[in-house]
Swiss-Prot record:
Signal peptide: 1-18
The species this protein was found in: Caenorhabditis briggsae
Disulfide bridge partners, by residue number: 96-109, 261-274
Name of the protein described by the UniProt record: Chondroitin proteoglycan 1
Positions annotated as glycosylated: 46, 143, 285, 635, 664
Length: 686
């Protein structure tokens, strides 16, 4: 016996590590056997205690050293209710329940009369009791008829296949216990005409169905229809299919789960419990079809419980000859009084091994499909547009195709068409949106029918604050029809900047390609008729330069009207050299908006647009040079025009009118001469 201190230390180490993993413990286990002769002859020390265990000199010493052993189960005696388990080098001793004996062949606890090592009284093992599995051990059979047993440990699925051999009066015993794939060794003794109890033992909680079919003496197999022991078409619950058996099934969501009653109890489907066979209606008077063998008949005794086997019945077994077994068929068995609750598969043969196949009958891995499925939405080319009040940091690019646009408006908010002129637009609220619009080539035609009288000077009313807008128009034939139009312009390559009251990170850029603009002007201009600008034109100074135009101009006295309050607006009109006649085929005219403007106003030099190798380019350049030359020659007129920005009284306006009249009275011949000089000067420079 080991000292208690050693056992206490072993238990402390075991509890601290808690290593119960025994993966692979059923394969390639080392076989150990401690065989003790229990004859008791000559020892003088063998005594039996009240429990029937042997004490004295033949008691088995326990080897608890797991330092050199692999993880697994090991026998500690030839016939012992205890066994040793090794896990991570830690040894534990475990006891079999219910007076069972550990059988190292099947790695399970078994009745003593089924353990070859217990050919008598089981031995006593002095140790501290614990629970653990053990190893597999095989003891050679003596030269007597010994049942060939195959027992599988619980919780490892197996399928037992039995082979029929020639007819001999040698019973072969097969014990199947599912859920334990192990290698099973079969010991076969020479055939003798000795009747040996034939019994099948299944470890608790190991559902296995073994079918035995009695065949004729000529070994012809009998085919039976296999019962459909599945959950097809059955509601959730427990079913034994009307048979007297310790095996039943549980149905859950259409899945079949094999189950087994413990301790040789039978399943009562009506009460859904496991009970003694005598209390199960299916097992009474042969009403149930028990799946046992025809050669096993148990006579129920009327004595008090329990009987010698520990249950409420006694078993009497007789061996049958020449009965092959066919697995998987429902047997035809007639039970008298009581039928044992275990199916028996028997093979009558000499030297016939039993093969155990690692197969789990009716074991289904359960798969649960929940109603809630990951949702997949398939839309047929459906685009979703979400409108959000605040959409930060979104860049939108819009490309417009070629559009021929005609605009007619009575009162239109100003749109500016110019080359390289930025436009500023104020938006109430456009948060964090960058929009780029590319407009292709647009051909625009504007028709203007206008009668202008030089005597009438444009009248500016309203409040026009501090905005200077310069528009340069290349040589264009222009026709404009307007009643009251706030200026509409189309520009080539004009970026538009949008300023938003609350617009973080928003930039809107509009790129307009080259636009060929054709303007046809059919105009009879009378100086007295000048367009009057009314309304609210904020901060704009507009300077218009008109290239070569055929125009008839009647110059009369120019009237300048001063509005009570028109701050920071200067409109200047300069009339260049004019061929005066009833119809003048060739007129070079420069028109500059004349407006009253404070000294803060800045003059903006307009870019020149050149079209090489074109008549329009030459005429435009010629007109531009002509305007410059005429302005240089006519010092009085130019000075008066420049000084008109600072006129503040009626006398100054009258003086400006006289200067213009003097300029217009210049002779045609002198104007022609100056024009020729300007042409020559232009050709020299180009």
């Amino acid at each position: 016996m080991l000292p208690k201190s050693v056992l206490i230390v072993a238990f402390l180490v075991a509890s601290s590590s808690a290593q119960y993993g025994v993966t692979g413990m059923y394969e390639n286990l080392p076989l150990e056997s401690t065989t003790v002769e229990a004859s008791g002859e000559g020892s003088g020390y063998n005594e039996s205690n009240d429990d029937g265990f042997v004490t004295g000199a033949d008691a088995v010493a326990i080897d608890t050293d797991c330092s050199t052993k692999e993880d697994g189960l090991y026998a500690i005696g030839g016939c012992s209710p205890q066994f040793l388990t090794c896990s991570g080098g830690i040894a534990r001793i475990m006891d079999c329940p219910a007076n069972l004996i550990y059988d190292q062949r099947i790695i399970a606890c078994e009745y003593s009369y089924n353990v070859p090592e217990c050919s008598g009284v089981p031995q006593d093992v002095s140790s501290t009791q614990a629970y653990y599995p053990a190893t597999e051990e095989t003891t050679p059979a003596e030269n007597v008829t010994v049942p060939a047993e195959t027992t599988v440990d619980p919780y490892a699925p197996v399928e037992v296949a039995t082979t029929a051999a020639p007819s001999e009066d040698v019973p072969v015993e097969t014990t199947a216990s599912p859920y334990a794939p192990v290698e099973v060794e079969t010991t076969t003794a020479p055939a003798e005409d000795v009747t040996v109890p034939e019994e099948t033992t299944v470890a608790p909680y190991a559902p296995v169905e073994v079918y035995t079919t009695a065949a004729p003496a000529n070994d012809e197999p009998v085919t039976r229809t296999l019962l459909d022991k599945t959950c097809n078409g059955k509601a959730d619950g427990f079913y034994s299919f009307g048979q007297c058996s310790d095996h039943y099934i549980a149905c859950s969501n259409g899945y079949t789960i094999p189950m087994q009653c413990p301790a040789r109890l039978s399943f009562d489907e009506a009460r859904v419990i496991c009970d003694y066979t005598m209390n199960v209606p299916e097992c009474q008077n042969g009403s149930g079809n028990y799946e046992g063998s025809a050669e096993e008949t148990t006579t129920e005794a009327s004595g008090e419980l329990p009987y010698s086997n520990g249950y409420g019945y006694e078993e009497t077994t007789t061996a049958a000859a020449d009965v092959p077994s066919t697995e998987g068929y429902a047997p035809e068995t007639t039970a008298e009084a009581w039928v044992a609750p275990y199916r028996l598969e028997s093979t009558t043969a000499a030297d016939v091994p039993t093969t155990t196949v690692g197969y789990a009958p009716e074991v289904i891995e359960e798969t649960t499909t929940s109603e809630y499925v990951e949702e997949t939405t398939t839309a047929a080319d459906v685009s979703t547009t979400t409108t959000v009040e605040y959409v930060p940091e979104v860049t939108e690019t819009t490309t417009a195709p070629y559009v021929e646009e005609t605009t007619t408006a009575e009162y239109v908010e100003e749109t500016t068409t110019a080359a390289d002129v930025p436009t500023t637009t104020t938006v109430a609220y456009a948060p964090e949106v960058t929009e780029t619009t590319t407009v292709p080539y647009i051909e625009e035609t504007t028709t203007v029918e206008e009668a202008t009288t030089a005597a009438d000077v444009p009248t500016t009313t309203g409040y026009v604050p501090e905005v200077i807008e310069t528009t340069t128009t290349p040589y264009v034939e222009e026709t404009t029809t307007a009643e009251y139009v706030e200026e509409t312009s189309t520009a080539a390559d004009v970026p538009t900047t949008t300023t938003v009251a609350y617009a973080p990170e928003v930039t809107e850029t509009t790129t307009v390609p080259y636009i060929e603009e054709t303007t046809t002007v059919e105009e009879a201009t009378t100086a007295a008729d000048v367009p009057t600008t009314t309304g609210y034109v904020p901060e704009v100074i507009e300077t218009t330069t008109t290239p070569y135009v055929e125009e008839t101009t009647t110059v009369e006295e120019t009237t300048t009207t001063t509005v009570a309050y028109a701050p920071e607006v200067v409109e200047t009109t300069t009339t260049p050299y004019v061929e005066e006649s009833t119809t003048t085929p060739y007129v070079e005219e420069t028109t500059t908006a004349l407006m009253f403007h404070p000294p803060q106003s800045k003059a903006t030099k307009l870019p020149q647009i050149h079209h090489p190798a074109s008549k329009e380019h030459l005429l435009s350049s010629h007109a531009h040079k002509t305007i410059e030359t005429v302005s240089m020659d006519m010092n009085l007129s130019s000075s008066a025009s420049r000084d008109s920005s600072s006129l503040q009284s009626k006398d100054d306006a009258q003086l400006l009118t006289k200067l213009r009249s003097a300029t217009n009275r210049t002779s045609t011949k002198e104007a022609t001469t100056r024009t020729q000089n300007m042409h020559a000067h232009y050709h020299r420079n180009h």
